[in-house]
Amino acid sequence: MENDRQAIVVWMNHLKQVRSLKRFGNVHYVSRKLKYAVLYCDMAEVEDISNKVSRFHYVKRVEMSFRPFLKTEYESKKEMMYEHKNEDVQISI
């Protein structure tokens, strides 16, 4: 069974405490320059985890990813190109 996952971006003052985020989910990426970490966890637990993480003194802010709510199914490019060509021809005539 596959669980729905969602990313949480955790902005931190210091990166020393990145290891402590592992208990909340999978730490996918850490940016040393911008001082943030991307944490993946179950979608059902996102709000609870973001509240818990935001209470730590080393956390500046917590943002949730909107990727699960975006449309990822696209029309084929060929159909779109064909429609655009027909529109151009009709306009030019």
Swiss-Prot record:
It comes from Listeria monocytogenes serovar 1/2a (strain ATCC BAA-679 / EGD-e). Disulfide bonds: none annotated. Its main location: cytoplasm. It is found in: Cytoplasm. Keywords: Cytoplasm. GO terms for cellular component: cytoplasm. This is UPF0298 protein lmo2054. The keyword Cytoplasm applies. The keyword Cytoplasm applies. Belongs to the UPF0298 family.
